[in-house]
């Protein structure tokens, strides 16, 4: 009898009696798409019993997932916020923009097959121009070289491959691969979407994915756990999205850093599984490691609807391991009464500027935001479920019944081929098209900047509103003057009808085709399709049985794919008299460090994509973007050109950064590029978690000012000495600053390196360290 499961009661989900070792010793496959990969609740329960005996305290659900996946539950040091956990994830998932570099790195490891189940999803390289099928056909043509590389490499290395048009990675994962209590890493920052099915799904850089695909344990600093207790029940215009919009306003873009957000309380049971996914998805915007919901009936219903009832039944047996213990302690607790929660709109330019709808009109006026709404966009990995589309269609139908349509431009991005086919069958797609919607491909599209926007000129101030998750400057359309707001699909549709930000559907009236006033009815929609899901077109490629004869060709003349050369090892010396490439002022996201949009096509070619290094960052010296002074010539040039000039002369350099440097996407290119162009260290007030790890993996030094105020003391034109020989666990490092005018001074720097990560730096990268051990 397993003690963890012996505590199980009949309280949850119809579970009856107690679970024994025999109850958990079953072969239930993780997914319908693979054979021989099983959910190992028995091993997870055994690991939890070992950890419980050691810690002797109640555990949060997040802790249960992590500790049940420990590589060494007997010997692992466990202290929230301090220890580095070595974990064994159940799965790895990559999207096509990050998969290229991950697979190129995996190839260099020389292994015949991935050691952990993995999938690749083609969703990032499809640009929104004319509409779904035409855009997909164009993407297949211009990205053929990359898709062929991914298809053949996946076949070669035993990786499941989801073709272009299949849908957005996170929707596909929720529909097919996520399971309660599992641990998955994904090379996309919105991987936490899987928390909607009770899975700890964590965004990582490609180098982390390579480690796990190669069979190594994955390292994660033991997160703190922030509890969000939900009470009451939502109604009317309030949607699940409003919960995370509210939480983002409370915690801000860095308030969740180093923590898992764990939702609990009676209010959880009123949310759909996909609604919970929405909330977890956007937890990435507050810096959270991931977000989770405990297993409940809504998750079971979703598993059943997606033809995975056997997983739901197995989860009911393991129910005790899929919820927090009574009296579990949280490092911070937030309470939200859903009965009182208002719809929210967040933005512009940052996802944590939260405004309830009742105050939004006033905020528009006070801040002089452009009130005319140019475009409304629904869909994306955050909000493209059947429930989202049904509720949006109900509002659109209400408008059509009154003889009016969308006043603003309106786009719809289905999250997957399954969603597209199902809403086509059930009529929501037709309603949204009649309303004026342009149906885009089942892909990321405008959410990640894959949008060939024509209705405004560059630098023309305008407003758009979307159901997306991220609204940084220029992210959607490369126009820094676009004021982008994020909200629920419901409010997007409502404001699109009005054509203005100065509309509150809870209080304001519209005019029908005859000039009569009316109010929109609150949205309605089923969480799951009554007639089941329609899978639509077959978009999956399984690895073949015979993989030995498959060859993965990369042309040496390709401008999109490039075989990687190992980075040089550290020379063992302090770096003296080196320049500051740029002192970044204000928000510096991974979009600023390595832009997406038109640059996505170079994600498999490190040298070419390095031509966008930090071109979006603001130079504190002159307030300009992509204009820095070469200390040798005294001339101003672009950031990449200046970095290349230093590299050609064998001169390493550093970057000075502000708060939460590297927030946003998980793209490891933002760490690979500075390393490739000769960078040695990034020194900031603070880092976003994924980017800090990515820099370490590539052999760079992510360092923080021991006193954040020292950021202001560093002249952008100063030369510096970096005492690399001081690098040791838990010890500060010294930065000696030599201003052009004035005396030199020392600044103390902090870091989070452990012993194994220091080896990455010494060897030149984590991949070099892996190769060295394999020799």
From Swiss-Prot:
GO terms for cellular component: cytosol; mitochondrion. Residues 1-25 form a transit peptide. Keywords: 4Fe-4S, Glycoprotein, Iron, Iron-sulfur, Lyase, Metal-binding, Mitochondrion, Transit peptide, Tricarboxylic acid cycle. CDD domains: AcnA_Mitochondrial (cd01584). It comes from Arthroderma benhamiae (strain ATCC MYA-4681 / CBS 112371) (Trichophyton mentagrophytes). Substrate binds at residues 95, 188-190, 470, 475, 603, 666-667. It comes from the Eukaryota. It is found in: Mitochondrion. Pathway: Carbohydrate metabolism; tricarboxylic acid cycle; isocitrate from oxaloacetate: step 2/2. Glycans are attached at residues 337, 383, 471, 608, 754, 763. It is an enzyme of class 4 (lyase). GO terms for molecular function: 4 iron, 4 sulfur cluster binding; aconitate hydratase activity; metal ion binding. Its cofactor is [4Fe-4S] cluster. Monomer. Its main location: mitochondrion. Belongs to the aconitase/IPM isomerase family. Catalyzes the isomerization of citrate to isocitrate via cis-aconitate. The keyword Glycoprotein applies. InterPro entries: Acnase/IPM_dHydase_lsu_aba_1/3, Acoase/IPM_deHydtase_lsu_aba, Aconitase/3IPM_dehydase_swvl, Aconitase/IPM_isomerase, Aconitase_4Fe-4S_BS, Aconitase_4Fe-4S_dom, Aconitase_dom2, Aconitase_mito-like. [4Fe-4S] cluster binds at residues 381, 444, 447. Binds 1 [4Fe-4S] cluster per subunit. Binding of a [3Fe-4S] cluster leads to an inactive enzyme. Its EC number is 4.2.1.3. It catalyses: citrate = D-threo-isocitrate. The lineage of its organism: Eukaryota, Fungi, Dikarya, Ascomycota, Pezizomycotina. This is Aconitate hydratase, mitochondrial. One of its GO terms (biological process) is tricarboxylic acid cycle.
């Amino acid at each position: 009898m397993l003690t963890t499961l012996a505590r199980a009661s009949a309280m949850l989900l119809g579970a009856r009696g107690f679970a024994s070792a025999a109850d958990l010793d079953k072969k239930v496959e993780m997914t319908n798409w693979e054979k021989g990969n099983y959910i190992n609740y028995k091993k997870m329960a055994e690991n939890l019993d070992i950890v419980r005996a050691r810690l002797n305290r109640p555990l949060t659900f997040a802790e249960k997932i992590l500790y049940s996946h420990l590589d060494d539950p007997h010997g692992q040091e466990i202290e929230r916020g301090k220890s580095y956990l070595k974990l064994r994830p159940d799965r790895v998932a990559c999207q096509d923009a990050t998969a290229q570099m991950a697979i190129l790195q995996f190839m260099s490891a020389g292994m015949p097959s991935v050691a952990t189940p993995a999938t690749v999803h083609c969703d990032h390289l499809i640009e929104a121009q004319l509409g779904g099928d035409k855009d997909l056909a164009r993407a297949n043509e211009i990205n053929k070289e990359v898709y062929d590389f991914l298809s053949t490499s996946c076949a070669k290395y035993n990786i499941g491959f989801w073709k272009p048009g299949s849908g957005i990675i996170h929707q596909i994962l929720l529909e097919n691969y996520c399971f309660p209590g599992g641990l998955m890493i994904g090379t996309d920052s919105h991987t936490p979407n899987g928390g909607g099915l009770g899975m700890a799904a964590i965004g990582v850089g490609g180098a982390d994915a390579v480690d796990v695909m190669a069979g190594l344990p994955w390292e994660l600093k033991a997160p703190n756990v922030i509890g969000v207790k939900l009470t009451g029940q939502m109604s009317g215009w309030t949607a699940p999205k409003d919960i995370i919009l509210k939480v983002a306003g409370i915690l801000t873009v860095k308030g969740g850093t180093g923590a898992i957000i764990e939702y609990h309380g009676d209010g959880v049971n009123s949310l759909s599984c996909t609604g919970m996914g929405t909330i977890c998805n956007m937890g990435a915007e507050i810096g959270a490691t991931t977000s989770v919901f405990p297993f409940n009936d809504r998750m079971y219903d979703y598993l059943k609807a997606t033809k995975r009832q056997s997983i739901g039944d197995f989860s009911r047996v393991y129910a005790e391991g899929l919820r927090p213990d009574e009296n579990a302690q949280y490092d911070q607790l937030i309470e939200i009464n859903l009965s009182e929660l208002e719809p929210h709109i967040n933005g512009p330019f940052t996802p944590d500027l939260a405004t309830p709808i009742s105050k939004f009109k006033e905020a528009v006026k006070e801040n002089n935001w452009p009130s005319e709404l140019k475009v409304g966009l629904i869909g994306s990995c955050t909000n493209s479920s059947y429930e989202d589309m049904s509720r949006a269609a109900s509002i659109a139908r209400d408008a059509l019944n009154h003889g009016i349509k969308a006043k603003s431009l309106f786009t719809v991005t289905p999250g997957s081929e399954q969603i597209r086919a199902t809403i086509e069958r059930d009529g929501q797609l037709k309603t949204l098209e009649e309303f004026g919607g342009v149906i885009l491909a089942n892909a990321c599209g405008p959410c990640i900047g894959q949008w060939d926007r024509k209705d405004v000129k560059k630098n023309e101030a305008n407003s758009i509103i979307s159901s997306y998750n991220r609204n940084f400057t220029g992210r959607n359309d490369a126009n820094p003057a676009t004021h982008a707001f994020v909200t629920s699909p419901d409010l997007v549709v409502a404001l699109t009808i009005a054509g203005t930000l100065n509309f509150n559907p809870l209080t304001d009236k519209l005019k029908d085709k005859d000039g009569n006033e009316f109010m929109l009815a609150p949205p309605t929609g089923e969480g799951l399709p009554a007639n089941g899901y329609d899978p639509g077109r077959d978009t999956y490629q399984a690895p073949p049985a015979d993989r030995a004869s498959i060859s993965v060709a990369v042309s040496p003349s390709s401008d999109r794919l490039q075989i990687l050369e190992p980075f040089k090892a550290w020379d063992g010396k302090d770096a003296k008299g080196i320049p500051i490439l740029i002192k970044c002022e204000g928000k510096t996201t991974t979009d600023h460090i390595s832009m997406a949009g038109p640059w996505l096509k170079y994600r498999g070619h490190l040298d070419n994509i390095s031509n966008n290094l930090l071109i979006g960052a603001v130079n504190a010296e002159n307030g300009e973007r992509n204009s820095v002074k070469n200390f040798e010539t005294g001339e101003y040039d672009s950031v990449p050109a200046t970095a290349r000039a230093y590299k050609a002369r064998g001169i390493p350099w550093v970057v000075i950064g502000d708060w939460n440097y590297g927030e946003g996407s998980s793209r490891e290119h933002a760490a690979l590029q500075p390393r490739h162009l000769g960078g040695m260290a990034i020194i900031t007030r603070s880092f976003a978690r994924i980017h800090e790890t990515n820099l370490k993996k590539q052999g760079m030094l992510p360092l923080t000012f021991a006193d954040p105020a020292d950021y202001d003391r560093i002249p952008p034109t100063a030369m510096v000495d970096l005492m690399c020989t001081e690098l040791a666990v838990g010890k500060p490092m010294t930065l000696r600053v030599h201003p052009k005018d004035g005396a030199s001074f020392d600044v103390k720097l902090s870091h989070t390196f452990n012993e194994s990560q220091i080896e990455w730096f010494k060897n030149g990268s984590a991949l070099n360290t892996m190769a060295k051990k394999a020799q």
